[in-house]
Amino acid sequence: MRTFCRTIIALYLWVLPAFAASKPHVISFGKVTTVKWLVGPNEDQALDLRVRALYVDTRLKEFTVGSPHEVTDRLFVVRRVFRVNDSLPEESSATPRWHWQRGGWLMVDRVTGRISQISLPEFDVYYSTPSWYRDYAAYCGVSDDGKKLFAVVARLGRRKPILKKALGDAAGDDLPDSECPAPLWQRQPARVTFEPDEKQKLTYSVRGHAVDIVNDSEEDESSAE
């Protein structure tokens, strides 16, 4: 009898971690709260941000803005916002002056509950406006010195972009998202169009890890179909 009981206990202790590991996580968003985002060269213009808290198993993990993009039935991406302390050194003993800032993008795994930051090449948190399709992100990237503009298509899981095409000099004003509109996607076939200004319209065909430019005749044939 003792041997039987020991066997049952051993099996229980062996199986228990497996059940604990497979317990599903609950991913949820909080209510929308409107906060002020100070922009411009002097940070004297206030824009509204509609912020939501991101919870994993009722625990606050991040703050987000905008709608999430469903990549798969398991993964989604969403943009991060955060608060930074704007206090000066001589004000360190005072109450922190929290200022909201817009950040990069997060990838959330519903099964593991893991939240990870996405590295998007040439992505500028102030000027770049990404457009998501499947596991691709298309946006206008900005060089590190802020002088050059690029058409960029990045794919989740890849360090290098599958497209990086120079678009000329950066010409955005002091407002966020002013470099160029979000690119437009279409499917069957998968294509993305960049229009950084009235004089430029570039369409690219996306096939896996490869991107090809679409000429005018191909675009006309696709429209006719």
State where each predicted segment sits.
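Sec-dependent signal peptide recognition
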Residues: 2-10, 14
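Boundary at the C-terminal end of the N-terminal hydrophobic targeting segment
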Residues: 18-22
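Surface-exposed loop/turn elements that mediate protein-protein interactions on large endomembrane-trafficking
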Residues: 27-61, 99-120, 150-169, 202-222
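Surface-exposed acidic loop/strand-edge motifs in secreted or periplasmic proteins
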Residues: 53-129
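Blade-terminus and WD-like Trp-Asp/Gly-His loop motifs, strongest in beta-propeller folds
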Residues: 65-72, 128-136, 177-192
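Beta-strand C-termini and the immediately following turn/loop, strongest in propeller blades
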Residues: 79-82, 96-99, 138-145, 193-199
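Short coil/turn segments at the loop-to-beta-strand junctions that recur within blades
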Residues: 121-127, 167-175
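Hydrophilic extracytoplasmic domains
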Residues: 179-225
